[in-house]
Amino acid sequence: MEAMGDREEKQGVSEQTETKTEGKQTWKAPDEGNFGRVAQNTAKSLKQESGINQVEMARADAIVAHPLWRKSVVCITQLEASREFCRHDVTHFLDVARLAWIENLERGLGVSKEEIYAAALLHDIGRHLQYEKGIPHDEASVQLGGQILSDCGFSADAKKRILEAIGGHRNKDTKTRDDLCGLIYRADKGSRMCLLCQAEKACNWSEEKKNRHIR
């Protein structure tokens, strides 16, 4: 998301191992090489084991288990530890996913739940690259998200839709669209409680963008 106050600021599924170094916890990313195959086999097994559609969100779960996603979340958390304005954490990702899913249901738009959650989980995942290298976070999130989506077994068409939503979540031209792009844009902005934010006066978001209502 285009964060409050800094709009212009410029590894398979098996294990996430934890080691301790001099009293501090550090993450050792597992090998990414077989991740895509493992994720796809997991989804296949779920589908075979149940008559209900447990497989619906298997790839979204695989995103959260992906070592690159987890590593990025840790980096963002560390870099935003002293941040005054809105942060880009898992709570925000899930807020966006749930708001987008609610609107999708209320309006009967028919957008895939898995694609909504995938886009929400990935839309800010490149935030640390903006802080570290000056890459706009929407562009960085498309770069990282593309790799993660491929590893998690998303089809080419689904990947295209999800990456479009990630890349357009700061573009106001997507605001009124009735597709995945529009859902993610509106949920992203609506997830921020500007009306209760103590840093609101120092935030450089426009009045049009600030969320001052319970929705």
Q: Model-predicted segments: where are they?
A:
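Metal-dependent phosphohydrolase cores
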Residues: 1-215
